[in-house]
């Protein structure tokens, strides 16, 4: 777990996926001093045992940003590894940008579209592959949903 140096809040770390659909309801374990099991990660400070790295390989080159971390964590678990968040902060890292900038009220259609398909959003090819791997049999709906929502939002 790393914390934002300005706010003191958790910026990146382990992620919990309480549903069988790994794209629904992502949460974070508490930073309360106790190590916690995780389903995947969004990590800026991650230790991977050599035997796991040999089995899983490196980050998948199809992903350029956050989905790469999450995909790697899921692949580690699929390979039989356990993921654990430390329960304490081990470093600092600013939270990079607002979450889901394409949802920002008042943004024009063009601004929402650019933010959505940009590297910190949900680039079409990457999001499609991520959904195909982890959203189950209805993955196409999960893949299309953010694009439809972003384009359908009323201008503010």
Please state what every model-predicted region is:
Residues 1-16:
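Short beta-strand-to-loop element that shapes/binds the nucleotide-sugar donor at the catalytic cleft/hinge
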Residues 13-19, 101-104:
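Short, hinge-like loop/turn segments at secondary-structure boundaries
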Residues 74-155:
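Active-site-adjacent helix/loop segment of glycosyltransferases
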Residues 40-41, 46-57, 62-89:
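A short, conserved alpha-helix in the catalytic core of glycosyltransferases
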Residues 15-24, 39:
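NAD(P)-dependent short-chain dehydrogenase/reductase
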Residues 26-48, 112-116:
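A recurrent flexible, glycine/aromatic-enriched loop bordering the glycosyltransferase active site
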Residues 11, 33-36, 54, 58:
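Residue-level signal for pocket-adjacent positions within structured domains
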């Amino acid at each position: 777990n790393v914390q934002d140096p300005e706010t003191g809040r958790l910026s990146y770390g382990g992620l919990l996926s309480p549903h069988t659909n790994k794209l629904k309801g992502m949460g974070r374990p508490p930073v309360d001093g106790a190590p916690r099991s995780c389903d995947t990660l969004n990590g800026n400070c991650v230790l991977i045992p050599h035997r796991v790295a040999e089995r899983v390989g490196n980050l998948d080159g199809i992903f350029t940003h956050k989905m790469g971390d999450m995909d790697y964590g899921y692949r580690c678990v699929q390979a039989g590894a356990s993921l654990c968040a430390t329960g304490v902060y081990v470093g600092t890292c600013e939270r990079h940008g607002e979450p889901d900038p394409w949802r920002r009220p008042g943004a024009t259609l063009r601004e929402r579209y650019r933010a959505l398909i940009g590297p910190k959003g949900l680039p079409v090819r990457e999001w499609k592959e991520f959904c195909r791997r982890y959203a189950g049999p209805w993955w196409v709906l999960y893949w299309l949903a953010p694009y439809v929502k972003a384009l359908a939002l009323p201008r503010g």
